[in-house]
């Protein structure tokens, strides 16, 4: 600690119920500090533990006060006084320090200090005294925390009760002897008076002083935390009851400390188990969160794919409807073609009939021409001109017959082709009808697929929303588990701190 620490002379007032507690080892290094002391001092627990306790000492405190405190504590006695401590930021606070040695197995193992708020009157009383002590301009000193005068008068407050009683008895004997001398009493009277005073003094010490010393000794054992048995007086008056009460208080404190220590150990074990379980739950919950988030991502991808498939199916449905309409129109066109081919076949048949008629006419004309030639030959010279005409007519009839035969052949060939074409057109018509029917079936299937895809999209959307809600719930659970882990860690820390505090008194 610096010989001139930074100070601001700014007072930090404490609440009435403020209690600061700390313990040190035999070399005055801090071994434990309660949360209130940590908060008021401005340091962290890690900064305080293992450090000398004078790190909170204010430079305005006189060295004589701490010298008196250590002198008293090392004698195994408690010390109480007003102390000005320094905070980490340089501010200060006033407390009434109650220090006591911690005795274990008859030996001092450390020191404990419990500090409460000092009143304004106490501060006003000691502040000028501390300044005077630092300046060396005072006739007073500090003895076991009390402000006393220097010299033999200052020793009177520290006299043991036994010597106080003896002093009073001696003073009474002197006064009595003076009275006897004044009345000129014989020497025997002096001796008798001396014996009476001695007997009274011995009786007073035996009946009053010694029991009070026992009470003080018992109370000191309770205050220092020393394990002890209850001392008893074979009397039931106020002193006997007081000693019993002090002893009972020590037993109750010991029972309370042992019970709390046992409970704290159970709480610590439970908090460790809870912390371990919470950590495992936190890990599992985090894995669940990751899995749910991965599921959400997969569901979103599936939803996008289903939406895309739904759009594709809808487009395919529209295309299938268009194709179905086109197929229907093609079927109607094919029906028209079939009808046209049937009409062509009928026309071809009629042409064949007409050709046959022309052929018959040519045949008849040829016969008539032959008959005319015969008649022209019979007529001689007069029938030559008619014979020439008859020859031409026969020639034309022959050509007509030949042409009719050629037309007949063409018509027969065309009729065969028309018949074949008609059969093919009818077959194509039937195929077109099948295509139209299949296209209608495909259209219906695509419509069903589109409807099913829409239903799947709706169902998947609902499932995605449910998974999203599950994700939110899982995340909230993860947050709750994290809060539980923090609370568990806090409980574990508090249990550890409480165990440390109980260990101080155990």
Swiss-Prot record:
Which Gene Ontology cellular component terms are annotated? plasma membrane
Span-the-membrane segments of this chain are: 167-186, 191-209
Keywords (alphabetical) are: Cell inner membrane, Cell membrane, Chemotaxis, FAD, Flavoprotein, Membrane, Methylation, Transducer, Transmembrane, Transmembrane helix
The cellular location(s) given in this protein's UniProt record come to:
Cell inner membrane
Question: How is it placed in the membrane, per its record?
Answer: Multi-pass membrane protein
The task this protein performs is described as:
Signal transducer for aerotaxis. The aerotactic response is the accumulation of cells around air bubbles. The nature of the sensory stimulus detected by this protein is the proton motive force or cellular redox state. It uses a FAD prosthetic group as a redox sensor to monitor oxygen levels.
Stated family: Belongs to the methyl-accepting chemotaxis (MCP) protein family.
Descriptive protein name: Aerotaxis receptor
Q: Which organism is it from?
A: Escherichia coli (strain K12)
Its organism's taxonomic lineage begins at: Bacteria, Pseudomonadati, Pseudomonadota, Gammaproteobacteria, Enterobacterales
Q: Which gene encodes it?
A: aer
